[in-house]
Swiss-Prot record:
PROSITE patterns noted in UniProt: B302_SPRY, ZF_BBOX
Coiled coil feature spans: 165-203, 243-274, 320-340
Subcellular location, principal: cytoplasm
Domain B30.2/SPRY intervals: 355-553
Protein's UniProt name: E3 ubiquitin-protein ligase TRIM16
Gene Ontology BP term (one): response to growth hormone
Organism, scientific name: Pongo abelii
SMART domains documented for this protein: BBOX, PRY, SPRY
Length: 564
């Protein structure tokens, strides 16, 4: 690239502590000894020594140290020699390295020799505006090296892209604006995250209070059940006691009656023994013998054996109940562990390890299609503002028009969401969807997602068991556990969704005519069968499940538009 000739340094003396070296005649610029000087130039020559002393005094001023650019300080004209009458500078000449007020700037505006000088806004200290190696004004910018250079430096940067300082500033200002916008966006995301965190904290307090109330109620019921069981056992024992005592008393009364009867029989036998008439004796004794009751009731009450069985039941039940109560906290802790339902443990129980070792991830559409899986929208989960068409392969947000779907526990009540009818479990799957309109979400979730709640954890972007990709009209965004991750992938109307269940991978690809572009990949811990999930947050959003036999269309100028 040819060197830039942005300025032609004139013969004016510099008012800096370290004046730049004069340019050589070969540069095409006049040297201090060539040409005739204008009245202003003569004045410059006559006052250069004093100006140099003034500049040295200014450079040594402690109040001005640490502010080389002069930001925030008033810049005065270097030609106004009377300190009491110095006027504010309106321009700085990078060629002369001098600040000028409106009056002393006029020669630069009327003198043809001075009109080629580069004028800028007033600068307090010119030392940082010239090249320390060549003592020449910095006049250009090297893009590869990202530094300001002078004309002499252009030879050292031969072959580099070199632009003027103004052009470089325009580029950097545009870049700065993009950086500012990006920072503002990130700041907004951070503020939104803080707001959501505060809302979540309130939700946690409410949720914990609700669970506490449930726990108090359940434990109250448990205590009442224990007291009731105790009362029932006591009543049961008392009834058994009364029955046993009643039985014993009945037997006792009968035995006492039998004792009285036997006393009478004893006396009768004594009487018959005294009969001397043999015929009378035989007749009376035989008659007595035929009427005698030789049976005796049992005097053993078997309640003790029954009580032993009852004691065993009570003891074992009490021990079991105590163990359950002691394991309450342990079970709660185990329930809260993420590793409790590690799918690898479940898979290894039915499939040998050597068969579920992860295979390499596909890279071409042909390779992805070997895991093709046909899914459809589940009408029993669709929100009433979502219309299903094309045999449940297309869904459209028709807000505010409702559809006469029956009220079901599985239907989403607040969020405009719908799940797939088919679950995804233990294998690899691949399907494609077309999205229309900003505000569409595509992802996975578990069957247990709350269908009736209005909190963020009821949508597929706001909990730790859902993973989703959002198209906001400008860019894609990944969502997990109410955390947003902006992505730099370009717009795609058709998305390929790849699930490696054993490997814990969920990937989204932009599908074009001849390429597959990775948009985002989630590392997941699947703990149960998952379902394809879709959220159409805005009116007229639409999502269509693609027949995988359809070849992708060639890229169009606007890939993600409105629903057809």
């Amino acid at each position: 690239m040819a060197e830039l000739d942005l300025m032609a340094p004139g013969p004016l003396p510099r008012a800096t502590a370290q004046p730049p070296a004069p340019l050589s005649p070969d540069s095409g610029s006049p040297s201090p000894d060539s040409g005739s000087a204008s009245p202003v130039e003569e004045e410059d020559v006559g006052s250069s020594e004093k100006l140099g002393r003034e500049t040295e005094e200014q450079d040594s001023d402690p109040a001005e140290q640490g502010d080389p650019a002069g930001e925030g300080k008033e810049v005065l004209c270097d030609f106004c020699l009377d300190d009491t009458r110095r006027v504010k500078a309106v321009k700085s000449c990078l060629t002369c390295m001098v600040n000028y007020c409106e009056e002393h700037l006029q020669p630069h505006q009327v003198n043809i020799k001075l009109q080629s000088h580069l004028l800028t806004e007033p600068v307090k200290d010119h030392n940082w505006r010239y090249c320390p190696a060549h003592h020449s004004p910095l006049s250009a910018f090297c893009c590869p090296d990202q530094q300001c250079i002078c004309q002499d430096c252009c030879q050292e940067h031969s072959g580099h892209t070199i632009v003027s300082l103004d052009a470089a500033r325009r580029d950097k200002e545009a870049e700065l604006q993009c950086t500012q916008l990006d920072l503002e966006r990130k700041l907004k995301l951070n503020e939104n995250a803080i707001s959501r965190l505060q809302a979540n904290q309130k939700s946690v307090l409410v949720s914990v209070s609700e669970v506490k109330a449930v726990a108090e109620m359940q434990f109250g019921e448990l205590l009442a059940a224990v007291r009731k069981a105790q009362a029932n056992v006591m009543l049961f024992l008392e009834e058994k006691e009364q029955a046993a005592l009643s039985q014993a008393n009945g037997i006792k009364a009968h035995l006492e009656y039998r004792s009285a009867e036997m006393e009478k029989s004893k006396q009768e036998l004594e009487r018959m023994a005294a009969i001397s008439n043999t015929v009378q004796f035989l007749e009376e004794y035989c008659k007595f013998k035929n009427t005698e009751d030789i049976t005796f009731p049992s005097v053993y009450v078997g309640l003790k054996d029954k009580l032993s069985g009852i004691r065993k039941v009570i003891t074992e039940s009490t021990v079991h109940l105590i163990q359950l109560l002691e394991n309450y906290k342990k079970k709660l802790q185990e329930f809260s562990k993420e590793e409790e339902y590690d799918i690898r443990t479940q898979v290894s129980a039915v499939v040998q390890r050597k068969y579920w070792t992860s295979k390499p991830e596909p890279s071409t559409r042909e390779q992805f299609l070997q895991y093709a899986y046909d899914i459809t929208f589940d009408p029993d989960t669709a929100h009433k503002y979502l219309r299903l068409q094309e045999e449940n392969r297309k869904v459209t947000n028709t807000t505010p028009w409702e559809h006469p779907y029956p009220d079901l526990p599985s239907r989403f009540l607040h969020w405009r969401q719908v799940l797939s009818q088919q679950s995804l479990y233990l294998h690899r799957y691949y399907f494609e969807v077309e999205i229309f309109g900003a505000g569409t979400y595509v992802g996975l979730t578990c069957k247990g997602i709350d269908r009736k709640g209005e909190e963020r954890n009821s949508c597929i972007s706001g909990n730790n068991f859902s993973w989703s990709l959002q198209w906001n009209g400008k860019e894609f965004t990944a969502w997990y556990s109410d955390m947003e991750t902006p992505l730099k992938a370009g717009p795609f109307r058709r998305l390929g969704v790849y699930i490696d269940f054993p490997g814990g991978i969920l990937s989204f690809y932009g599908v074009e005519y001849d390429t597959m572009t990775l948009v985002h990949k989630f590392a997941c811990k699947f703990s149960e069968p998952v379902y394809a999930a879709f959220w159409l947050s805005k009116k007229e959003n639409a999502i269509r499940i693609v027949d995988l036999g359809e070849e992708p269309e060639k890229p169009a100028p606007s890939l993600v538009g409105t629903a057809p």
